[in-house]
Amino acid sequence: MENQDTLRLLRECDAGAKMGVASIDGVLENVKNQELHDLLAQSRKRHEQLGNRTMELLSALGDAGKEPPAMAKGMAAMKSGMKMMMGNSDQQAADLITDGCGMGVNSLSRYLNQYPNAQPQAQKITRELIGEEESLAKSVRPYL
């Protein structure tokens, strides 16, 4: 059971990190404020690093990882595109990122609870990704 919980939790963590990168990519080019841009770029890098660490653990278990659901990616891209056309790109970007972080924290926390027998390494990396999402949401609040 421990190995299955570990594998499942890592897959969800992988999908979450990829979704975070994609969400940041979806708004980054429209951000005008340099501080906000830098903040998002740093978080994107951190999401990539966590995703890479997750993939290393998945590879060691013989797994190729998990892509975010196509429907979720498509809906997020559509929402980003529509919101970014509404004006004040920095405020819209902060709003989208805040929403995305909230969804990420909720789903990753749910998976952490759902797979309690996952190895400590898998739980740790999931908690780190949750922490990154919480930190990013807090950091973009001044731009809302």
Task: Identify the function of each model-found stretch.
Residues M1-L144:
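Amphipathic alpha-helical hairpins
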